[in-house]
């Protein structure tokens, strides 16, 4: 589905990013690996090159830096002469992320979370839109979450050390609307923008949480990163050429 398509993946070393890069390569596309962590990036590059017997471009990328974004875009274009799609699966967090409850968080801590994550997604989309306008076409997919679409099921967190972060929900809701706003503003430019809101991704969560979460779903419950990659490939392919401005939910029915 992605033959000869050049796909720039930000956050390539995360669970979803890594799974997506593999899926792109399996579908005969070319994945550009971009991440802020150079050590993880080097490991991923070696792993994928060994598995797929193909030389890949890896780039250090900080989505909160316009200079970093432009440098990465320039390097990608210099190598491939085009970028067909941009997927942002980055997950920038502040030093206190996940450590402080909402009611105890300071203004500065709240702003740090919003600025890094939502601000970074806005900035990255801004720079890729500029590039895609010059190229005369493009495809942007931002990764979001069901937490930006539905209210949390707070009861699932009872008797665990986990919590539902208000900042996270606000960030993801903002990313959803970023996609709709951009898609509408970019009518008649041959640039599509969509958002994928995924259900929870398995990451060694407590069994009590997993059991409660599973009861809210149709068949599996928490998903593996690979479970959402088919939808991402569809959005990156020409099969979805008339899909824009949408937030596609992949959550095994959790939101019902």
UniProtKB/Swiss-Prot annotation:
The active site is at residue 168. Keywords: Oxidoreductase. Pfam families: adh_short_C2. InterPro entries: NAD(P)-bd_dom_sf, SDR_fam. CDD domains: SDR_c8 (cd08930). One of its GO terms (biological process) is fatty acid elongation. Belongs to the short-chain dehydrogenases/reductases (SDR) family. This is Post-translational flagellin modification protein A.
């Amino acid at each position: 589905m992605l033959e000869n398509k050049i796909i720039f993946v930000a956050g390539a070393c995360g669970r979803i990013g890594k799974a997506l890069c593999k899926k792109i390569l399996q579908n005969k596309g070319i994945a550009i690996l971009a991440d802020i962590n150079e050590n993880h990036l080097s490991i991923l590059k070696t792993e994928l090159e060994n598995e797929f017997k193909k030389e890949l471009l890896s780039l250090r990328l900080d989505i909160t830096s316009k200079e970093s974004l432009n440098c990465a875009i320039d390097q990608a274009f210099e190598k491939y002469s085009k970028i067909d799609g941009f997927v942002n699966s980055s997950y920038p967090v502040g030093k206190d992320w996940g450590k402080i409850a909402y009611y105890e968080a300071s203004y500065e801590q709240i702003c740090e979370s919003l600025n890094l994550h939502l601000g970074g997604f806005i900035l990255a989309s801004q720079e890729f839109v500029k590039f895609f306008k010059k190229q005369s076409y493009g495809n942007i997919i931002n990764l979001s979450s069901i937490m930006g679409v539905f209210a949390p099921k707070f009861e699932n967190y009872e008797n665990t050390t986990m919590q539902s972060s208000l900042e996270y929900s606000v960030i993801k809701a903002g990313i959803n609307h970023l996609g709709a706003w951009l898609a509408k503003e970019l009518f008649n430019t041959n640039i599509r923008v969509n958002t994928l809101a995924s259900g929870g991704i398995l990451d060694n969560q407590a069994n009590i949480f997993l059991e409660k979460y599973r009861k809210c779903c149709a068949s599996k419950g928490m998903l593996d990163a690979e479970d959402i990659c088919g939808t991402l490939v569809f959005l990156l392919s020409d099969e979805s050429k008339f899909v824009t401005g949408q937030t596609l939910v992949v959550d095994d029915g959790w939101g019902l």
